[in-house]
């Protein structure tokens, strides 16, 4: 029993993170040969004592050891494509590259460059970030939809490092003095650095502190409060992530916000079901009743949304947003790269608010720590392909947001939002 416990700990927390699963398999093959040789030696000795001079030749233990060594020698290395793509391995072409592959104690991490030239960041076999235009837009907006609506943010907590693109967008705001990135897997850092041209070298910013910790543990134990907390874990059906979409998690997030603070949450509408999305919305809106939904898809159809919540209803000041966009060339360029050039174009991504969705969410349960139903409900719908109808139902009762600013800008925004002009 002691050996089994020590073996599992050594393999999980030292051998695989230090040398990889391929070397772990080879080592286990050799150890199996050694174990067999030890057992055979004991058996041979027992037979010799029992036979007392019998001419029967024992099987030499070196045969067992040799088989173990041979097995280790012929075992193929674990292909990077399996670590990166999981069930989506059929996406990979022969000319694709894997400039970074690493295995940690918490997850496997890989960067895959496809034939189209775009980089894909993978964690435990699932794409978590890319630099293709549609995903880059989402990743940037997680940052900018936090930074621009807040009138004077100074401190930020980013839950989940990913490609560092959301944190990088927030690092462009001169008023933000401190950014804490909480990441459970240290091996992610190597992958994040490969996105430096898109994340503005965020890991080298003097504003940034990287904390390697479980997000729930960090939030529960830190005394620090933040103006902005962004949460961008991977899909809730992925092992261990549903707990970052629970009522208790959002309660901790709310308690760690400074007065006037904002929390943002990425929610994918693909690889899930409408019931799962309703549970996510109901849970978030339980902590932030006046939360808002923002669609990051340039076409206005369903793909990803970002939730923004705070203690008070969100007030959108178009003039202040435009001032901050136009006076900071870095922020302007960051938004322009994802086809946004001013406040009206940004707020044109607005979808709905918590009160707008009350009828849609009526009777829906919430995700709790002691009943993580979301993990299983979303996992049953990986191939559902319901993103467009989910978003349409979500915003069916939408009303015009709380917007102030130049009357001409407000009128243009009203025409776009209520006239469904993208």
Show where each model-derived region lies.
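Membrane-embedded alpha-helical segments of integral membrane proteins
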Residues: 1-48
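Phosphate/oxyanion-binding loops and surfaces in catalytic or ligand/nucleic-acid-binding neighborhoods
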Residues: 40, 287, 312-315
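Soluble small-group transferase modules, centered on the S-adenosyl donor enzyme superfamily
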Residues: 52-150, 155-157, 197-200, 214-223, ...
């Amino acid at each position: 029993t002691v050996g089994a416990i020590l073996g599992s700990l050594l393999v999980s927390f030292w051998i695989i993170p230090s040398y990889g699963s391929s070397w772990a398999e080879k080592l286990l093959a050799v150890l199996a040969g050694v174990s067999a040789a030890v057992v055979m030696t004991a058996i041979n000795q027992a037979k010799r004592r029992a036979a007392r001079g019998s001419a029967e030749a024992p099987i030499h233990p070196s045969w067992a050891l040799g088989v173990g060594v041979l097995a280790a020698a012929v075992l193929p290395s674990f292909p990077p494509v399996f670590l990166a793509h999981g069930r989506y391995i059929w996406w990979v072409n022969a000319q694709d590259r894997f400039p970074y592959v690493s295995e940690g104690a918490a997850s496997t991490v890989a960067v895959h460059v496809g034939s189209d030239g775009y980089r894909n960041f993978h964690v435990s076999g699932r794409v978590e970030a890319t630099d293709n235009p549609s995903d880059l837009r989402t990743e940037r907006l997680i940052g900018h939809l936090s930074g621009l609506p807040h009138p004077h943010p100074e401190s930020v907590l980013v839950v989940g490092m990913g490609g560092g693109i959301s944190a990088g967008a927030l690092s462009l705001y001169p008023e933000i003095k401190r950014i804490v990135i909480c990441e459970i897997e240290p091996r992610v850092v190597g992958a994040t650095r490969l996105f430096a041209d898109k994340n503005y070298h965020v890991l080298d910013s003097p504003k940034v502190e990287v904390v390697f910790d479980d997000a729930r543990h960090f939030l529960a134990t830190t005394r620090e409060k933040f103006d902005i907390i962004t949460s961008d874990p991977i899909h809730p059906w992925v092992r261990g992530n549903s707990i970052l979409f629970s009522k208790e998690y959002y309660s901790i997030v709310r308690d760690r916000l400074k007065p006037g603070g904002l929390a943002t949450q990425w929610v994918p509408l693909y690889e899930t079901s409408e019931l799962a999305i309703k549970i996510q919305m109901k849970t978030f809106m339980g902590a932030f009743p006046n939360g808002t939904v923002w669609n990051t898809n340039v076409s206005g159809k369903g793909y990803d949304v970002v939730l923004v919540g705070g203690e008070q209803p969100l007030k959108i000041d178009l003039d202040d947003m435009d001032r901050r966009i136009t006076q900071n060339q870095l922020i302007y360029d960051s938004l322009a790269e994802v086809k946004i050039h001013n406040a009206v174009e940004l707020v044109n991504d607005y979808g709905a608010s918590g009160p707008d969705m009350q009828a849609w969410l009526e009777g829906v349960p919430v995700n709790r720590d002691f009943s993580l139903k979301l993990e299983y409900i979303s996992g049953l719908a990986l191939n559902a392909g319901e993103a467009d109808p989910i978003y349409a139902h979500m915003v069916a009762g939408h009303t015009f947001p709380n917007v102030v600013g130049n009357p001409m800008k407000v009128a243009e925004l009203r025409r776009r939002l209520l006239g469904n002009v993208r």
